[in-house]
Design a protein with these regions (language model features):
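Internal glycine-rich, Lys/Arg-flanked active-site/core loops of soluble domains
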Residues: 1-100, 104, 108
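Active-site and NAD+-binding cores of ADP-ribose-processing enzymes
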Residues: 44, 72-75, 79-156
Length: 157
């Protein structure tokens, strides 16, 4: 649950397709304005599948984030999210955005501007580069690859 919102049943059958496309369109447009710098994503208590850690037939390790992916410029914020569930696995993705592979900076419109959020569109690929341990947190250096087929609303209609 994110920020206290319940499971899918609370949507009363509405899957918010138009809203999802509108948000995605904003990310596609605004990501072009985001400075290519390092961002972090903290995950608490989650277990990634074995297929994430083992190289596939092309020699690549990682996976695809099916949903919008929230990250932050602030490593401490990510570490706080990762350490949220005491006694459960703590993981932080550390990623360097590039010339093409960038998320949209949301601090200017966020209810939580101190989190310095950068949002990536659905279907962002995360390719594992290396890992290290920082205290009780596993830090995974990943290379993001944004979904280049994502269209803006103007392209869809």
């Amino acid at each position: 649950m994110l920020r206290g919102f319940g499971p899918h049943k609370d949507c009363k059958g509405n899957t918010y397709v138009t809203t999802t496309h509108a948000i995605n369109s904003c990310i596609v447009k605004n990501s072009k304005l985001t400075k290519a710098t390092k961002v972090f994503r903290g995950i608490s208590g989650g277990m990634l599948p074995k297929s994430f850690w083992e190289a596939n037939d092309q020699g690549v390790r990682g996976g695809i984030e099916a949903a919008f992916m929230s990250t932050t410029y602030d490593r401490d914020v990510a570490m706080q999210y990762a350490s949220g569930d005491a006694g459960k696995p703590a993981l932080v993705f550390e990623m360097q955005m590039g010339m093409i592979d960038r998320g949209a900076e949301l601090g200017w419109l966020s209810q939580y501007p101190h989190e310095e959020e950068v949002l990536f569109n659905p279907l962002t690929g995360l390719e594992v580069q290396s890992t290290r341990v920082d205290g009780a947190v596993l830090v995974v250096l990943v290379k993001p690859s944004v979904n280049l087929t994502s269209m803006t609303l103007e392209q869809v209609i």
